[in-house]
């Protein structure tokens, strides 16, 4: 049990962002979290195998007057533990509906404690990570002047990077966004290149991310959720996993954000360079003309952003692949 509780504690501390549930009362606090499947913590279904692409967690906290708080943890509607802890810190995140909860070592509860029923009221919120949340919390970074300690990075997908808790990604500049008020897509370079080069198989995992993602902002994932994502940097054309030059398959209007107007209509493919550290846009990819000639993209529309720690955590917790890339076992 000690080994299980250590793994459970690490999972709760390092892979969950908490949403306060409307079932809270003055005496009972209820928090919910939804997070992608963990590389380190494996909840088991009644059939004996993991059977979902998400982990829904309900946390019920009771604080008796003369003892430490004790907590009951439900995962995907199954009670997995009732335990106590000497340390429990709840910190609301400013300007969001999230809370961060830190758990000290989990220990056995008093012998007379009864496991409370799952009190949470399931109401999946429809909010998603927005471009404004990214823009207002991120830093614009010059690729040649990366902050100290961030020179070593891991490539995510075709054009994003992770280093020391932060995601680096090119984002459409606010000046260009103001010129395209009707543009509704998540304005990351990863998303734009994905739209240009993805295949037409809607169940393709690399191109659409099916059964890989959750939306942790919702606090709960419905069983019929398709697990796709419109914002995760892991989404990459399945063809790009096999070769560097990938044909353009649709959304050609988006080429105006990447290339000079005089050559857009002649571009047939994208060539990916897969740089291993954050760099300028023209070192990430180029265009390929119908003649086979390569042409540089234009950089003016794009800023390299260093996402805040909190936004980076949201994106990591949303994705099984990002978790495997970015999280360490604790």
Swiss-Prot record:
Pfam families in UniProt: Herpes_UL16
Origin superkingdom: Viruses
Principal subcellular localisation of the protein: virion
Keyword Iron: no
Endpoints of the signal sequence: none
Coiled coil: none
Subcellular location: Virion tegument; Host cytoplasm; Host nucleus
Keywords: Host cytoplasm, Host nucleus, Late protein, Virion, Virion tegument
GO-annotated cellular components: host cell cytoplasm; host cell nucleus; viral tegument
Record keyword Phosphoprotein present: no
InterPro entries (alphabetical): Herpes_UL16/UL94
The protein's role, per its UniProt record: Plays a critical role in cytoplasmic virus egress. Participates in the final step of tegumentation and envelope acquisition within the host cytoplasm by directly interacting with the capsid. Upon virion binding to target cell, a signaling cascade is triggered to disrupt the interaction with the capsid, thereby preparing capsid uncoating.
Quaternary structure annotation from Swiss-Prot or TrEMBL: Interacts with cytoplasmic envelopment protein 3 and with the capsid.
Family under the similarity heading: Belongs to the herpesviridae cytoplasmic envelopment protein 2 family.
Protein name in the entry: Cytoplasmic envelopment protein 2
Gene: 33
């Amino acid at each position: 049990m000690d080994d299980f509780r250590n793994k459970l504690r690490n999972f709760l501390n390092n892979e969950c962002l908490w949403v306060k549930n409307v079932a809270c009362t003055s005496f009972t606090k209820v928090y919910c979290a939804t997070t992608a499947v963990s590389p380190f913590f494996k909840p088991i279904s009644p059939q004996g195998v993991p059977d979902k692409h998400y982990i829904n967690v309900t946390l019920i906290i009771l604080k008796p007057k003369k003892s430490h708080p004790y907590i009951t943890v439900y995962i995907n509607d199954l009670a997995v533990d009732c335990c106590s802890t000497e340390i429990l810190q709840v910190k609301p995140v400013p300007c969001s509906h999230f809370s961060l909860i830190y758990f000290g070592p989990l220990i056995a509860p008093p012998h007379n404690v009864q496991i409370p029923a799952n009190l949470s009221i399931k109401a999946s919120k429809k909010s998603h990570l927005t471009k404004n949340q990214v823009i207002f919390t991120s830093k614009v970074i010059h690729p040649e002047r990366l902050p100290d300690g961030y020179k070593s990075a891991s490539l995510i997908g075709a054009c994003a990077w992770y280093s020391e808790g932060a995601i680096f990604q090119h984002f459409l500049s606010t000046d260009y966004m103001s010129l395209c008020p009707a543009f509704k897509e998540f304005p990351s370079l990863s998303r734009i290149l994905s739209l240009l080069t993805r295949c037409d198989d809607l169940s393709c995992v690399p191109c659409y991310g099916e059964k890989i993602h959750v939306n942790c902002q919702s606090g709960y994932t419905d069983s019929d959720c398709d697990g796709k994502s419109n914002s995760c940097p892991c989404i990459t054309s399945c063809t790009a996993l096999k070769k560097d030059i990938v044909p353009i398959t649709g959304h050609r209007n988006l080429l105006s954000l990447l290339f000079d107007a005089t050559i857009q209509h002649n571009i047939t493919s994208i060539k990916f360079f897969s740089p291993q550290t954050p760099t300028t846009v023209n070192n990430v990819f180029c265009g390929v003309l119908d003649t086979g000639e390569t042409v540089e993209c234009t950089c003016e529309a794009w800023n390299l952003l260093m996402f805040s720690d909190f936004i980076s955590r949201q994106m990591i917790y949303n994705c099984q692949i990002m978790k495997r890339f970015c999280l360490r076992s604790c």
